[in-house]
Regions:
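Proteins enriched for Cys/Gly/acidic motifs involved in redox and nucleic-acid/cofactor modification
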Residues: 1-235, 274, 289, 311-322, ...
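Conserved SAM/AdoMet-binding glycine-rich loop
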Residues: 102-107, 116, 219-342, 353
Length: 467
């Protein structure tokens, strides 16, 4: 089997057929699509492919669903809260479908790869006409055409041939900040995580394709490019070419231009000294490492099936601190894993204090159907977990304030990303992914600016443009 395969010309034919159907229905007016994406950046990248295919089918895009001809929710299965939001928002479309029967409402993404979810959609949401999972993206036009053709519901999930498809048209959401997938799937099977079940096994894209896409993005003016994968440190496994993630990172970094290069997500068990050395020596690589540790207790890490311990994690963190000047460290933490005690939780707090992260993405454990952790005994009450969660936030807030305060008086290179609608202030990020707010012209958006840091407020910096 080749490393990758192009989506078929047949799908381009289906895009043309969709355009013909919509042209008849709309009597020459442009059809409108509304896409809402939940979850991770990998979902954002998938939605950009879907938008690319819809654009080739003649669609324009709306920010609200009210006047759309096609409505699609790209869903996330990582936490219960995201699933609840999807069900609530889909239910709210019932009246819209009643008023406009020709609207096609569709759901895709990770939730749709779960049998119990697909069954619930089929039984409880009869106005949803198209459902497909993460493994069906390469023939989305065919599925959509079939749903439009006779109005019959189309449901497809679990069609994983472990093949990786290339050649998608892509309509990116941003013009200066972009996502570049380098691999899909995960082989780690952490006991709490549903990703391997809904995204499949690891599949790496060919290096020359990734480098070519990165070069095109840089030449098109992209200033901040993030290489994406569920575990980027596993990149290259299974490819016919002998290549690893550090080698790929160095090759992309060698492309001329004024840009930052980021990546996510790294798994501590595969995070090597070679990768740290590559970041340290890089020209464009952001001095930011996101390395999820999830829990500071070895006992809990073993129950999570993380394949590293506290000592191994701290060894790679300390090596990174030693080698990379101005390193910004961020991480993910799960609070209240089944069987976790307050003594275990205190080990998490001590690790946070020892490392001094710039920021943390912290979540209370959310059981996922089909994972081993969902069947584990979980005696700690939700109220107790919430108490631990607040304690952790207090500790991290103090650390973040200290780290940000140390930057006051320094001048930082900042990518200006947006304008605050209420305050009129500009908002940007440093290479270390720290938010900076400042006064300035909207013309600065999408450009790098030198900013003197004048004030720190918890994890946000205030600054002023250096003329």
């Amino acid at each position: 089997m080749p490393d990758s395969q192009k989506i078929s010309e047949k799908q381009s034919e289906y895009m043309n057929l969709i355009a013909e159907i919509m042209d008849i229905r709309k009597r020459g007016e442009k059809p409108v699509a509304y896409i809402r994406t939940y979850g991770c950046q990998q979902n954002v990248a998938d939605s950009e492919k879907i938008k690319g295919m819809l654009e080739q089918s003649g669609f324009e895009f709306a920010d609200e669903p009210d006047n759309a001809d096609f409505i699609l929710f790209n869903t996330c299965a990582v936490r219960e809260h995201a699933e609840d939001r999807v069900f609530g928002n889909v239910g709210a479309l019932k009246n819209l479908k009643r008023k406009h029967p020709q609207i096609l409402i569709a759901l895709c993404g990770c939730m749709m790869e779960q049998e119990h979810v697909a069954n619930r959609i089929y039984k409880s949401f009869p106005f949803v006409g198209l459902v497909f999972g993460t493994h069906s993206l390469h023939h989305f036009p065919e599925l959509m055409y079939n749903a439009l053709l006779d109005g019959k519901r189309v449901f497809e999930r679990g069609n994983d041939d472990n093949q990786l498809y290339e050649g998608f048209p892509v309509k990116r959401d941003g013009t200066f900040k972009g996502w570049l997938p380098i691999m899909y799937g995960c082989n780690n099977f952490c006991t709490y995580c549903v990703v391997p079940y809904v995204r499949g096994r690891e599949r790496s894209r060919e290096k020359n394709i990734i480098v070519s896409e990165a070069k095109n993005m840089i030449e098109s003016g992209y200033k901040d490019i993030t290489l994406l994968g569920q575990n980027v440190n596993s990149y290259g496994k299974g490819l016919s070419e002998n290549v690893n993630f550090s080698q790929l990172l160095r090759e992309v970094d060698s492309i001329d231009g004024d840009y930052w290069l980021r990546f996510m997500t790294s798994h501590p068990k595969d995070c090597s000294k070679e990768l740290i050395d590559t970041i340290a020596a890089g020209t464009h690589i952001s001095k930011h490492l996101h390395l999820p540790f999830q829990c500071g207790s070895n006992r809990v890490l073993k129950a999570m099936n993380r394949h590293y311990d506290r000592k191994k994690y701290l060894e790679i963190i300390n090596y990174a601190k030693e080698k990379i000047d101005g390193l910004s460290l961020t991480s993910d933490i799960i609070v209240g894993f089944p069987g976790e005690t307050y003594e275990d939780f205190k080990e998490t707090l001590s690790l946070i204090r020892e490392v001094e992260f710039t920021s943390l993405f912290t979540f209370i454990f959310s059981p996922r159907v089909g994972t081993p952790a969902a069947k584990m005994d979980d005696p700690i009450p939700a109220e107790e977990k919430s108490k631990w969660f607040r304690e952790l936030l207090d500790v991290q807030e103090e650390i973040a304030a200290k780290r940000c305060s140390s930057m006051v008086g320094k001048t930082e290179k900042v990518l200006i990303e947006s304008e605050n609608d209420k305050s009129g202030e500009l908002c940007g990020r440093t290479s270390g992914n720290i938010i900076v707010e400042l006064e300035g012209s909207k013309d600065c958006i999408g450009t790098f600016q030198n900013v003197k840091i004048t004030k720190a407020r918890n994890w946000i910096l205030k600054g002023e443009l250096v003329k």
